Amino acid sequence: RGTHGIGIKATNAMSKRFTVWTCWKGDWWCIEYRDAALHKEPYKSKPPKLPHGLKAKRGTVVMFEPDLSLFHKGTKMQLSSAKEWSKLTSYLVKGMTVKLTNSSGETREYVSEGPATFVHDKIAELKATQTGKTFLYSSKELDVALAFADVEGSHVAAYTNGLRNVEGGEHVTACIDSLVRSLKPYL
């Protein structure tokens, strides 16, 4: 998390088994890796059986078994990190459902109406009141949700390929510069 270009590749590299199923045009396809190397080329398959016993009906399912030799004894992924990632991912893809199953078999679903829900929830988290409507823009390349609220400071968050640009970077700079240029004539 947090570094561009490594997400799924790093997970595969650090896994004993890494399997991805996806439903494409009504058919399930699967690709398998073992110890970070291709084990089976993509092939038609049955829907994967999920940890909670249900069969997936559509979408993409990723399952992996970490290579424990790469981790310190007792290393675990914190459930709070998995919850945060699941919630964030649902914000970034409108209508996508992310299901997180914990070690007890309990499943929580995260689904949202996209970036607008992220903005709404962030304003609520800050205990602020929104002033005006949320500006929304969506294209193939870009999604923008922008709102003003009665809160101190700036709370700008940028994401690229599902990963947060923690230090802002050019995405945030370009957004703020464009906003300032467009509002300047009205100040």
Question: What are these model-derived regions, one by one?
Answer:
Residues 1-124:
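GHKL-type ATPase core
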Residues 44-47, 80-83, 87-90, 95-187:
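GHKL/Histidine-kinase-like ATPase module
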